[in-house]
Amino acid sequence: MKIKNLLIILSSLFLSFAAFAGGHKYSGPDLTGQKVVMFGPWLSPEQETMREVGAIFEKATGATFEYGGSDSFEQQVMIDLKAGSAADLVVFPQPGLAANAAAMGGLVPLGDDIKQMVLDNYAAGQSWVDLSTYADENGNDQFNAIFFRTNVKSLVWYSPDNFEDNGY
């Protein structure tokens, strides 16, 4: 799939979610005949939820949407990227894994319009842009991702005084 088409589909996917959530009619490009494949770590029940969201995308755009999840996502996505057979859209559960994929040339940078949308609409927008910007295979920073379904699982609380007192 060409980069331009991927960006159109990505933009349409997120715009159709927002449009239907607010009861508005989708007015993006007609994607009839296009197929969008998404791969991620979600299995039941999240997999069914993602497929329901995909059905909204299909209704809005005319495209076909497929989501596949795997309990060995982290290994499989890297194999797929190296083989050149990755899905159109990939849901990375960790920014570090996305950074590794970018460093091997596996991610397509998103446009400045998507970056501006994040800056304008996400609380602490610049922080989200920074977390979504990774060095490509040439070492150039590229804006590559949009965060959604985020949660905090690895927050560490500590006392700076105790930390310093113990020489950490």
Question: Can you name each region flagged by the protein language model?
Answer:
Residues 161-168:
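Aromatic-glycine-rich donor-binding/catalytic loop that engages nucleotide-sugar donors
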Residues 81-92, 106:
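Alpha-to-beta junction loops
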Residues 69-76:
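Short helix-initiation/N-cap motifs at beta->coil->alpha
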Residues 1-36:
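Short, low-complexity disordered leader/linker segments with a strong preference
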Residues 24-30, 95-158:
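Hinge/lid segment of periplasmic solute-binding proteins
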Residues 43-64, 163:
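Short, polar/charged alpha-helical segment
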Residues 55, 59-62, 82, 102-103, ...:
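Sec-exported extracytoplasmic/periplasmic mature domains
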Residues 32-43, 63-68, 89:
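Short, well-ordered beta-strand elements
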